[in-house]
C-alpha cells in the first residue's frame, strides 16, 4: 500500500516537473517570435551564427529556434512522444552552453567562477538538464 501511494505522489511530481519545463520552454520560446522581447536574442543570434557559419539569416535562425522550443513545450506539456522531446531538450541544452566557450567575455567576469548575468542565465540551464535526466529515467523505467 505504501509503495502504491509513493508511486502516485511520485507520478504527480513527475507530471509537475514535465509541465514546469514545458512552461519555461513556452515562455522563452514564445518571446523569440517577437523582435526585442527576448533578453537572450542577441546572444542566441550570435551563437547560432557562429555554430552554423552564418548559413541562415539571424531572423530565420531565431524563428527556427522559437519554433523548436515551442514544439518541445507542446510535447512536454501534452505528455506525447516524451522520449523525442527529452532528447530534444538535451540537444537544446547542449547548444545553450556553447556561449560559455564562444563568448567567454560575455559569460564571465572572472573565468571560470565569476559569471556575468549572461553566464548566470546560461548556467541556470543545468537545472533543466537535471530535471530532464529525471524525466528520462522515469521513461526508461516505464518502458521496462
Short names for language-model regions:
Residues 1-144:
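Membrane-interface extramembranous regions
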